[in-house]
Amino acid sequence: MQPPVSIGNDFTIRDKTGQDIGIPGQWDPSMKPKAAKPVNESKVYLKEAEARIQHAEDIVFWEGSKGAARALESLRNLEKGKHTDVTIKWDGSPAIIFGRNEEGEFILTDKSGFVAVGYDGKAKSPEALANMFLNRSGGKNRSKPGYVAFANNMKNVFNAYRDCLPEDFEGYFKGDLLYFNTPPVNEQNYFEFKPNIVTYEVKKDSELGTDIQASTTGVVVHRILNEKGTEGPISVDLNSFFQGDDVLVFPPQTVEKAPVINNESISRLKQTISKNSVALDKLLDETTLVGLKMKDFPKILYAYTNSKVDTGLDSLGSDFFEWIRNSKVSGVKQKKILEHVQSNTTGWTGLWDIVSSIMSVKDDIINQFDSHDAIVRSSIDGQSGGEGYVLAHPEGDIKLVPRATFSKANRAVKR
């Protein structure tokens, strides 16, 4: 079990007093954290951290040419052994939060319940959890058999999630539920489950398959939270922290085989970045954007790119001003953006050339990962592929998500 820690921006583990006690993976049990009074061994201390992981191509919006170069190098290095830094991005649902408050009471809820105003969304019993869901929308969901079944499923797993936590643990885990009951085994001898958009198959005669067989419910955890909802990185060993077999907290599932990188595509991308770097950085210069009162320009570019998932990702940038006219961006800011782009046409054209090229290289890599024979297979409506992958990087993790397939299917779901 891990000691009480926080994780600094330099990835150094610190104790409650702020004293450095090592880096992840190098904790020495003989080194006791210094504290003014005895502290709970399982208590998790948080430092506010940025939760969003950027798509490989979107890094350019915030980091300019340096971000483009980082994305390029990250993708190229996957062929050179860095594929071991890539893990499956699980598509779970619903998003849940579970843990214990300062009084030691166990709570299981969802994101809305955790921050609820006007009602107590931090359910402390199976019955309270089911009623919380059924009472939403004025109780209309009580007449929907599917929703009633969902509420009962949540009720039935409450005790399992309570019992999987050490009794002295204080804090919360945020994650996505993968299944309520042990998944069935299909004709190909794979466990099969579909928590949301993606259907997953896990080879039964694998280590993960053995863990699934022993479990009742499965979850993938992403972050830890404190009572105020402040998020931080996971600071416990997921393989040893949780108790019993009923709840399987899925460990990071690493990609097993390196992709073959298209050197011609990489070379073209490198040349495009080099040719446009000065103009690109001028277009995205934060000081300039602040002066023009359009510091949120990168967020607007991100929103536009996301919208193109619905209409097609070809010719990115060509219909930006048509899109922005129908957006929530004010008329005054729209005019400023137009004038700024007209003054930086080379950077504007280069931006979308780079974004499209990164996306193309990324999608080719994703397709290779999806086609490899692996213990975990994923598909959407019968077509190979899932939510994608996450590439660990010291300057910020990178999402490798197939926007044209998963993102489009996910955005089309009515919730």
Predicted regions mapped to residue ranges:
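Intrinsically disordered, compositionally biased, charge-dense segments
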Residues: 1-47
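Core nucleotide-handling region used for phosphoryl-transfer chemistry
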Residues: 45-84, 89-94, 98-415
